[in-house]
Amino acid sequence: QPLNIDEDFSFFNPKAGIFWKINNNNNLYASFSVANKEPTRNNYTDNLFAAQPKSERMFDYEVGYTFRKGWFNAGVNLYYMDYKNQLVLNGQLNEIGEAVAENVKDSYRMGIELMAGARITNWLRWDINATWSRNRIKNYTEYLSDVNEDWKDMYSENWGISQTTRYIGTTPISFSPDFMANSLISLDYKGFNASLQTQYVSKQYLNNAHQEDCTLDAYCVSNLNLGYTFKLKGLKSVNVGVTIYNLFDETYESNGYASGSAVYEGHGKNQIKDKDSKLLYTSNYAAYYPN
């Protein structure tokens, strides 16, 4: 698809931080940074109704603590990311099945990250991490495609594609779970190595309208890696291994899309929406698939 766009983006991305080594086992740190991101080509080609996509800007504030002593280490990190014109997925797909993003004027991501690791023996280690977060858009307005009772697109009186706006307010950001956790148990003994990785992801919304019928359910999935390393004449070493994904055969969806429509009274060729058009109901549709 040809594009006739001539835009220049000039960014200043400062970073600053402090680090305090309390002693050999305890450390504190704090940081501030600014990050900018220009729109991608898809952001331009997928932009059917709104103004041209804008670059996004993030102000990132973080503070944390780490502890390390012998066989054990742990840490905690608190963060607040303040966005201007963040490009977020809106749950829709373009004509070739890629996710569509839109600018939202004000939004934020804030949370706490916890991590810990322990070397239980010389050959066995366990690492875990978890993130609790709150990811929100402020003052969000949803744009719904207008259709008639035959589910055909409706048009304005000047034959532009018609849309209905719906003010949502503060709403969760799509594809942004409130809680995630990972566990990794790893073993390395006399050439044999194995690891069990488990991931938990809480519920996610497929769009930014906070609709319970457009969500991905929470899921927990584990993968097992097994390997063995040995020497072979003429070679330094040989490694053979196998990976079993979804070890416990869990059924889950990790991705999907959603679309919404405003259904107005009208049939057949009557596809013009005017001030007298009667809104019958709004409809949401969600579909799911694995990554």
Model-derived regions: residue spans:
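Conserved C-terminal beta-signal and adjacent last beta-strands/turns
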Residues: A30, R125, S162, T170-N291
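Structural signature of outer-membrane beta-barrel channels/translocons
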Residues: F11, F19-N25, E56, T66-G70, ...
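Short sequence motifs at beta-strands and strand-loop junctions characteristic
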Residues: N4-F12, P53-R57, V104-Y108, I173-D178, ...
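Gram-negative outer-membrane beta-barrel transporters
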Residues: Y80-D82, E102-N208
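Solvent-exposed loop segments that connect transmembrane elements
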Residues: Q1-D6, N42-L48, V88-V100, N139-G169, ...
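Outer-membrane beta-barrel proteins
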Residues: Q1, N27, K37-N43, A74, ...
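Signature of Gram-negative outer-membrane beta-barrel scaffolds
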Residues: Q1-N23, E142
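Membrane-embedded beta-barrel scaffold of Gram-negative outer-membrane proteins
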Residues: K21, N27-S33, K54-M110, M115-R119, ...
